[in-house]
Amino acid sequence: MKKILVINGPNLNLLGIREKDIYGSTNYNKLLEIISKKANELNLNTLFFQSNHEGEIIDRIHKALDENIDGIIINPGAYTHYSYAIHDAIKAVNIPTIEVHISNIYAREEFRKRSVIAPACVGQISGFGIKSYIIALYALKEILG
């Protein structure tokens, strides 16, 4: 069974509470439950990590090497737009990574329309609500074989 690490960045722990018109009403724990259920159906094992701190996210990406993680799904939150350190960590571990976003970042404020993370990833999925994570699971399943 392939191991998929799902990393969620700043403020994603507040899903279902913050800006429901943008991020929906599903809370964070329910999101993890939905992802786990679909991953099991796809014969994928998921591990979850959430942090509001850039360094902790980088450390978790590095730790993925020791755990023989096969793929990463990352929603870097606001770090999407300026964290070259997370970009570099993804490049360093060389694990297929998909960047996801609940909202369509290209239909939002100007500063949100640029990702410095996406160029380090095999792909980016944006704008499908929490289904963005499910689409990413299908994509990684295909990529990993």
UniProtKB/Swiss-Prot annotation:
Classification via Gene3D superfamilies: Dehydroquinase, class II
EC numbers: 4.2.1.10
Active site residues according to the UniProt entry: Y23 (proton acceptor), H101 (proton donor)
Keywords (A to Z) from UniProt: Amino-acid biosynthesis, Aromatic amino acid biosynthesis, Lyase
PROSITE patterns for the chain: DEHYDROQUINASE_II
GO MF: 3-dehydroquinate dehydratase activity
Pathway of action: Metabolic intermediate biosynthesis; chorismate biosynthesis; chorismate from D-erythrose 4-phosphate and phosphoenolpyruvate: step 3/7
Class of the enzyme per the UniProt entry, highest EC level: lyase
Transmembrane segments: none
Family: Belongs to the type-II 3-dehydroquinase family.
Function: Catalyzes a trans-dehydration via an enolate intermediate.
Alphabetized NCBIfam families for the sequence: aroQ (TIGR01088), PRK05395.1-2 (NF003805), PRK05395.1-3 (NF003806), PRK05395.1-4 (NF003807)
UniProt cross-references to HAMAP family, sorted A to Z: AroQ
Record-given protein name: 3-dehydroquinate dehydratase
Source organism: Caldicellulosiruptor saccharolyticus (strain ATCC 43494 / DSM 8903 / Tp8T 6331)
Lineage per the UniProt record: Bacteria, Bacillati, Bacillota, Bacillota incertae sedis, Caldicellulosiruptorales
Gene of this entry: aroQ
